[in-house]
Curated annotation (Swiss-Prot):
<dbReference type="Pfam" id="PF00103">
    <property type="entry name" value="Hormone_1"/>
</dbReference>
<feature type="disulfide bond">
    <location>
        <begin position="202"/>
        <end position="212"/>
    </location>
</feature>
<keyword id="KW-0964">Secreted</keyword>
<comment type="similarity">
    <text>Belongs to the somatotropin/prolactin family.</text>
</comment>
<dbReference type="InterPro" id="IPR018116">
    <property type="entry name" value="Somatotropin_CS"/>
</dbReference>
<dbReference type="GO" id="GO:0031667">
    <property type="term" value="P:response to nutrient levels"/>
</dbReference>
<dbReference type="InterPro" id="IPR001400">
    <property type="entry name" value="Somatotropin/Prolactin"/>
</dbReference>
<dbReference type="GO" id="GO:0005615">
    <property type="term" value="C:extracellular space"/>
</dbReference>
<keyword id="KW-0732">Signal</keyword>
<protein>
    <recommendedName>
        <fullName>Prolactin-1</fullName>
    </recommendedName>
</protein>
<keyword id="KW-1015">Disulfide bond</keyword>
<dbReference type="GO" id="GO:0005179">
    <property type="term" value="F:hormone activity"/>
</dbReference>
<dbReference type="GO" id="GO:0046427">
    <property type="term" value="P:positive regulation of receptor signaling pathway via JAK-STAT"/>
</dbReference>
<feature type="signal peptide">
    <location>
        <begin position="1"/>
        <end position="24"/>
    </location>
</feature>
<dbReference type="GO" id="GO:0008284">
    <property type="term" value="P:positive regulation of cell population proliferation"/>
</dbReference>
<keyword id="KW-0372">Hormone</keyword>
<dbReference type="InterPro" id="IPR009079">
    <property type="entry name" value="4_helix_cytokine-like_core"/>
</dbReference>
Amino acid sequence: MAQRRTSGTNLFMTVLCVVAMCRAVPINELFERASQHSDKLHSLSTTLTQELDSHFPPIGRVIMPRPAMCHTSSLQTPIDKDQALQVSESDLMSLARSLLQAWSDPLVVLSSSASTLPHPAQSTIFNKIQEMQQYSKSLKDGLDVLSSKMGSPAQAITSLPYRGGTNLGHDKITKLINFNFLLSCLRRDSHKIDSFLKVLRCRAAKMQPEMC
């Protein structure tokens, strides 16, 4: 399984490198590959959230911060597909790249915290966080190439700094709550990234909006 994931990532980056040098691959195929990566990223975050929920203390659901506290909440984004379909290609790419960039540091925090997470599935969670980091890096590199083909508006990135610190808590419950909260923010943002890239994929393939 790990070998297949690595092979898929290598193939994706190989294709993008070819495009960067000779622009031989149609952009709709590149968006298809990017969409596959974003779909996997969102799938992993969803699976991890479900994994954590299976052993999440009841008090955690009461005191966990609300979604409005996520470090990316200040970014104005479409709230559904219909709104996303009204946004330009360049702006959608800029939004996707801004969100992806905003998770570079928090993913490191999640990875570091997962290594000592007080959870029965700690090893599985840690491995999936590592996998998410790989997909995130590969997708970021791919979107950098795609945005360069779309012009300067698509290359604009809104800074969304993470100020939550590297220590998610000293006691078991606090650490689980903060870890779950950060992961829930990632799940929400990975869904946005995936949705935006699927709209871009549809447009690149010249599909009808209702097919997106």
